[in-house]
Amino acid sequence: MLSLYEAAQFRVHDEEILDEALKFTTTHLKLILPELSNSLLAQQVGNALKFPIKDGVVRVEARKYISFYQQNQNHNQVLLNFAKLDFNILQMLHKKELCDITRWWKELEIVKALPYVRDRLAEVYFWSLGVYFEPQYSTARKILTKNISMISLIDDTYDIYGTLDELTLFTEAIERWNIDASEQLQLPSYMKIIYCGLLDVYDEIKKDLANENKSFLINYSIIEMKKMVMAYFQEATWYYGKTIPKMEQYMKNGISTSAYVQIAATSWLGMGNVATKDSFDWIVNEPPILVASSIIARLLNDLLSHEEEQKRGDAPSSVECYMKEYGVTKEEAHIKIRNIIENSWKDLNEEYFKVNGTIIPRVLLMCIINLARVIEFIYKDEDAYTFSKNNLKDVVYRILIDPII
């Protein structure tokens, strides 16, 4: 039954039998779980109900599976030892990467200069690690971590700090993408720090890519950064104009504010020859698999963070947009949005089966899949990115610091 439950998670649209199979297995696994006591099977069922394989962050699930396998009386000790050794060796590499990035972050002195931003470097690195953990993608992970860190600063600035006039200037500066723009537009001092830091990060990335004669690929990431910032600015105009847009308008803008189109394009930088110019041309056209991943990211973020954001003063989320447009309660809006997320997972599964091995290599598609998995993990029960001192902090410690003995 557990295997059927896991398999049914990969269903696509119009697969009514698998829809029924998922409902059936979910119901019965929940019913039998209390009767399994503290057995190994109980642990596996409990974990699967919360994090099915479809949603699992690979390194997190690998650590859990090693523990499950060790408890199996029929385990192969040689295989178990090898799995532990492999995990710990990779963990040492990941720890070194995080140390290198932490040094860069501290040199920026961002937190001291911008006290309103979320200081979440370890969590951002975990995000990148969820996209790809393999040793050959070390450079790509560093690039992606720095990129997401800068996005987080920009997001916080648009959400909670910048005035509309200041955000207008910053949006124009991003559009110009020139170091002189900060002085020409007379950006506020705190925005100059972000702007110059962002351009410095991209200069570093360009140098890294120059070694492979691929520095031109950075332009794809810059294009998506501009689109994302423009979408953030659109949200700011809604907030300051006290406007609640229609759901369709919100979702169109939300593809960009999820940041996942930009992050996906940037995640391929540093991956070597597997990411070709044709691949980047494909991704910036927002293929359905990427749109699905972006919708999942946008809506999960909204569901778990909208109440806190509305308290402090922020643009309307999908919840507020849906409530106003259709005249429903918050609970009804949540149910509808959960359905949209579920359908987006079906879209994502379907597009993966279509595209895999035909247009885009599997390793690149898995970056998009894994981005959806990470967002599912971080926003499963709470906004664990904003409130990271809860469960996420413990997970980051187990994955990056604590070796398997």
Curated annotation (Swiss-Prot):
Encoding gene, per UniProt annotation: TPS16
Motif residue range(s): DDXXD motif: 155-159
This protein's name: Sesquiterpene synthase 16
Residues annotated as binding Mg(2+) 2: 155, 159
Species of provenance: Solanum habrochaites (Wild tomato)
Source superkingdom: Eukaryota
GO annotation, biological process: diterpenoid biosynthetic process
SUPFAM superfamilies: Terpenoid cyclases/Protein prenyltransferases (SSF48239), Terpenoid synthases (SSF48576)
One Pfam family this sequence matches: Terpene_synth_C
